[in-house]
Amino acid sequence: MRFLRFLKIFFTVIRFGLDEMMLSRVNDRRVRLLLRITTIGRKFDAPPGVRLRLALESLGPIFVKFGQVLSTRRDLLPVDIANELAKLQDQVPPFDSAVAIGLVEKSLGAPVDVLFDDFERVPVASASIAQVHFATVKAGQHAGKAVAVKVLRPNMLPVIDSDLALLRDIAVWAERLWADGKRLKPREVVAEFDKYLHDELDLMREAANGSQLRRNFAGLDLLLVPEMYWEFCTPTVLVMERMVGVPISQVETLRAAGVDIPKLAREGVEIFFTQVFRDGFFHADMHPGNIQVSLDPAHFGRYIALDFGIIGALSDFDKNYLAQNFLAFFKRDYHRVATLHLESGWVPPTTRVEELESAIRAVCEPYFDRALKDISLGQVLMRLFSTSRRFNVEIQPQLVLLQKTMLNVEGLGRSLDPELDLWKTAKPYLERWMNEQIGLRGWYERLKIEAPQWSKTLPQLPRLIHHALAERHDHTRGANDEMIRQILLEQKRTNRLLQGLLLFGVAVGVGAALARVFLALAYGG
């Protein structure tokens, strides 16, 4: 079966001329000769990126997902290919509703008619991983609640594991034979995709992500996140509050309903930067299909977030790196940007800061020919990542995910309001975060976090030091026995010498005193 799948991939490569794309970049002469033979008499009008996208679409949903993940790695791919892969969409027909109902009943341990009223047989959404049905909870504390029931596609894991095994094999060969193999790190990309895909297959993880995001925005009049109904959540079924809104892409519908579109654009950016710099936890799949706007009078004009399968997380170090890079960029302090890259530890220590600064200046300076409102922070990050390739910078996956999400947010914001000044909206968040981290308040907050641990550790410190020294002594005792013996011998010799000198000194002193007495008696002095 795996061999047949491999054959299909091979013939798809030939059909769409992907072998021709690889021809000039293959190291092995024999493979290059074979590829030349296969390309004789063939001509392709479509650009390479289009052919790659069509090939992935023909190979099915797993390869479509792989292409989508690959499109976010703009630090590795040429811009034209990354842009083309970004067009890949999950266009998968729904699976049989009877199968979906069977999966829900098996997962939740009760018939659908006992759990829900009005379980809609026709799904409202279908993708490569799962599909969604609307229903109403029948009994219990959530009785009467309108819900969305997300059901994982059946028998996904064997198919995914089989395709991932093939992708791993292809990655190994690509790294060996392709001139760009080591730079593009195909095995690392496949490993990242493996983790991403298996995370999406666990709906409990998605429910936890949604619950965290909801808690983060509780009390803020910015974002609506559906409540998760945990008694109905399992790794294969997720039941959450049903949210009704208008997709963000339907701008004219929103305008006709009276939504303040420029305000909506600004709030979208505020939501994103709140997630990034306040929470370090952000929705990383913010394309128009997952973002809606409520027209409910109680929440009119507020964003609704859906689908929490892909979430990014940033450490304080990551946030500091981003904030300082953006602030230095807008001050045109390219030396600081280069230094930040070196201080991150992601750049080889042999890199000359002046060379990196020069490359960054060449990338960034052209942006300042345009108005600040026309500068794309996502594009700046993307260009910086691309430049970093030349210096073998290890770009962290969470920052690449952030950059891809930032491009989505910017595109969404400017589709709503072409005059949106992203920098003006973002700058207060960056400066506030920097002040909170570096200022007295930041020091106080860190002290509050660390103080309980210090109060626990400090009384134990003498014992811990004694224990560590004793362990070190025991560990090194055998190796140092000879040295200790020599030191003791030397100490004994030194002691004998000191004793001799002391006795000699005493004798001299006593002798001198006796001599003075004798002379006094003899001469009557």
UniProtKB/Swiss-Prot annotation:
Annotated TM spans: 501-521
Compartments it resides in: Cell inner membrane
Single GO term (MF): ATP binding
A Pfam family recorded for this sequence: ABC1
The keyword RNA-binding is assigned to this record: no
Topological type in the membrane: Single-pass membrane protein
Binding site for ATP: V124, A125, S126, A127, S128, I129, A130, Q131, V132, K150
Record-annotated Protein kinase domain positions: 118-500
One term under GO cellular component: plasma membrane
Enzyme class: transferase
Active-site residues, record numbering mapped to chain: D285 (proton acceptor)
Enzyme Commission number(s) of this protein: 2.7.-.-
InterPro entries with a match to the protein in the record: ABC1_dom, Kinase-like_dom_sf, UbiB, UbiB_bact, UbiB_kinase
SUPFAM superfamilies, per the entry: Protein kinase-like (PK-like)
GO biological process, one term: regulation of ubiquinone biosynthetic process
Pathway the protein acts in: Cofactor biosynthesis; ubiquinone biosynthesis [regulation]
Function according to Swiss-Prot or TrEMBL: Is probably a protein kinase regulator of UbiI activity which is involved in aerobic coenzyme Q (ubiquinone) biosynthesis.
Family the entry assigns: Belongs to the ABC1 family. UbiB subfamily.
Protein name: Probable protein kinase UbiB
Organism expressing this protein natively: Paraburkholderia xenovorans (strain LB400)
Gene encoding the protein: ubiB
